[in-house]
A protein has these predicted regions:
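Active-site bordering "gate/hinge" segments
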Residues: 1-215, 341
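Internal helix-turn-beta structural module
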Residues: 282-344
Length: 345
C-alpha cells in the first residue's frame, strides 16, 4: 500500500544486512506476483566501507551513475534496513564520505528517488537494534510493531488541523533550554507523513524560508550520521546560515560535514514529531524524528514538496524533544504558543 505498486511497473528494492533477508525475499515475491519487475539489490554498510576505503573518485562517481540510471527507470523504491552495525562507516575518511554523498546519495536519492518515485524506507527489528534501544528483543519487537502499525488513516485526519495552521503561519519561534530560534515558513506549505514514505511514520513537515533563520538551537537527542556518533549538537544561525556549530563528541567531523557544500549550512526542513507510540530515542533517526513531543530540523537539502530552494548532498535530521522530562519548551506561531512541553494547545 505504501508505494501503490501495479502490474507492469518497475520497483527498486534495496535491503541492508542479513537480518532483513526473509523480508527481502518476500518483497521480491510479492512485487513479482503483482506483475511488476523488481530490481533487487542486497547492500550492507560493510560492503560500502570496503568500496569507499579502496575506490578512486572516478569509481565512486561511476557507481553513482549506474544506480542513478536504475533509479530513473524505476516507478517505486523500497528500502529495508536491519541496522546491525550503525557505526560501520565510522572509520571511512571524511573526504571519501563527502565524495560518496556528492556522487551517490545526492544524485541517486535526493535528485531522482525522492522527487521522481513512489518510495518507502523502513527498518526490520533485530537484536542489535534492541540493544541500542536498551530493550530486550521481545520488548523492542512490541515497540516496533506498535510504532509501525499505528492507524495511519486516523493519524492523517488528526493531523489536518496542524497542517492547516502551518500553511497559514508566517513567523515561528522556538524557546527551550539552550534554544531561542526564529524563522519564517510563509508560503512554503506543509506535508503530513502518514505511512507512505516511512515506516514508522508520523510527522508534519515544512521548511524555513532559507535566509530567515536566526538564533540558536540545541538538539538534546544523540544521533549518528554516516556511522559517526554525535551528542548535544548546538547550531547558531544568522540570516539562515549556520555560523557556529558544536557537538560534545566528534566536533571536528561535524565541521567537515557542514563544509560539504554551501547548502549544508542552511536548513531544508522543520517538522513536528507526532507518532504517539514513539516516546524515547533509540539512536535511529527514522524512529527518533517521529517522537511525540519532539521537533526536528534538517540541515541541507529541502524536499520539493515543501521547498525553500536549498540544495545539498546533506539531509540530516536533528531532533529536540520538548517533553517535561527533557526540559520542556514552547513553539510559537505568529506570536501565539501552539505547543508547550511537547503538547499541542
Amino acid at each position: 500500500d505504501a508505494v501503490g505498486l501495479t502490474k507492469g511497473e518497475r520497483i527498486y528494492i534495496e535491503a541492508f544486512r542479513n537480518s532483513t533477508q526473509d523480508f527481502f525475499r518476500e518483497l521480491i515475491a510479492v512485487s513479482s506476483k503483482i506483475g511488476a519487475t523488481p530490481f533487487y539489490y542486497f547492500n550492507d554498510e560493510s560492503f560500502t566501507r570496503s568500496f569507499l576505503l579502496n575506490a578512486s573518485e572516478a569509481a565512486i562517481k561511476a557507481h553513482g551513475e549506474i544506480h542513478r540510471r536504475l533509479m530513473a527507470e524505476s516507478d517505486a523504491y523500497v528500502a529495508v534496513r536491519g541496522n546491525d552495525d550503525v557505526f560501520a562507516l565510522s572509520d571511512v575518511p571524511e573526504k571519501k564520505m563527502a565524495l560518496y554523498r556528492k556522487n551517490y546519495l545526492q544524485p541517486v536519492h535526493s535528485e531522482v528517488r525522492v522527487p521522481q518515485t513512489r518510495w518507502c524506507v523502513m527498518r526490520y527489528p533485530n537484536p542489535a537494534m534492541a540493544a541500542l534501544s536498551r530493550m530486550s528483543l521481545k520488548e523492542f519487537e512490541d515497540f516496533y510493531f506498535d510504532a509501525c502499525l499505528v492507524d495511519y488513516r486516523k493519524m492523517e485526519k488528526e493531523l489536518q488541523p496542524l497542517k492547516k495552521l502551518m500553511d497559514r503561519t508566517d513567523k515561528v519561534r522556538i524557546v527551550a533550554p539552550g534554544t531561542d530560534i526564529s524563522f519564517s515558513i510563509k508560503g512554503i506549505g506543509s506535508v503530513i507523513c502518514c505511512g507512505h514514505r516511512n515506516i514508522p511514520d508520523g510527522e508534519v513537515y515544512t521548511a524555513p524560508v532559507k535566509n530567515s533563520v536566526n538564533g540558536v538551537v540545541q538538539f538534546n537527542t544523540d544521533t549518528t550520521y554516516n556511522g559517526i556518533f554525535f551528542s548535544n549538537i548546538r547550531l547558531v544561525f544568522k540570516d539562515g546560515k549556520i555560523i557556529e556549530a558544536s557537538s560534545l563528541v566528534n566536533n571536528d567531523k561535524l565541521q567537515k560535514i557542514l563544509d560539504q557544500d554551501e547548502g549544508a549550512r542552511y536548513l531544508g526542513e522543520f517538522s513536528f514529531g507526532m507518532n504517539p507510540f514513539i516516546t524515547k530515542p533509540i539512536l535511529d533517526i527514522l524512529f527518533d524524528e517521529k517522537i511525540a513531543g519532539s521537533f526536528h530540523m534538517a540541515i541541507g537539502n529541502a524536499y520539493t514538496t515543501a521547498d525553500n530552494g536549498n540544495r545539498s548532498a546533506i539531509h540530516w535530521d536533528l531532533i529536540q524533544i520538548q517533553t517535561p522530562e527533557k526540559g520542556g519548551g514552547e513553539i510559537y506561531f505568529d506570536g501565539r504558543v501552539v505547543r508547550r512541553n511537547g503538547k499541542l494547545l
